[in-house]
Amino acid sequence: MQNISPKVQNQINMLQQMQQQMQTILSQKSQYELAAQEARRAVEELKETDDSAAVYMNVGTVVMQKPKSEVISKVTEKIETLEIRIRSIEKQEKMLQEKFEKLQSQVRSEIEGRKTPDAN
């Protein structure tokens, strides 16, 4: 990296930061997708449960018995919120990926422009 200009070194550092941001975004997305999947599974189970069955739900630090329809409604609402977050993260991911690819292309051009031909 001794022959690389400070500008290119800075761009390389930016690429590394973008990679870290991408990893963070992908981790968040994965967590939200897992939570949404678990919530969907819970709704499916609740729908198969008899209407007279006791259904419990966390309310803060307390677990309370609630009507099945209310629990389904709350969990469905949670799924919708998670899906909105996932879509938002996907937009961030796409924008960051585009910026990354553009900067990566610039860095490659800079580096390739500085290469000297081999004397073979």
From Swiss-Prot:
The gene is pfdB. InterPro entries: PFD_beta-like, PfdB, Prefoldin. It comes from Methanospirillum hungatei JF-1 (strain ATCC 27890 / DSM 864 / NBRC 100397 / JF-1). Belongs to the prefoldin subunit beta family. It is found in: Cytoplasm. Heterohexamer of two alpha and four beta subunits. Keywords: Chaperone, Cytoplasm. This is Prefoldin subunit beta. GO terms for molecular function: unfolded protein binding. Its main location: cytoplasm. One of its GO terms (biological process) is protein folding. Molecular chaperone capable of stabilizing a range of proteins. Seems to fulfill an ATP-independent, HSP70-like function in archaeal de novo protein folding. GO terms for cellular component: cytoplasm; prefoldin complex. The keyword Cytoplasm applies. CDD domains: Prefoldin_beta_GimC (cd23162).
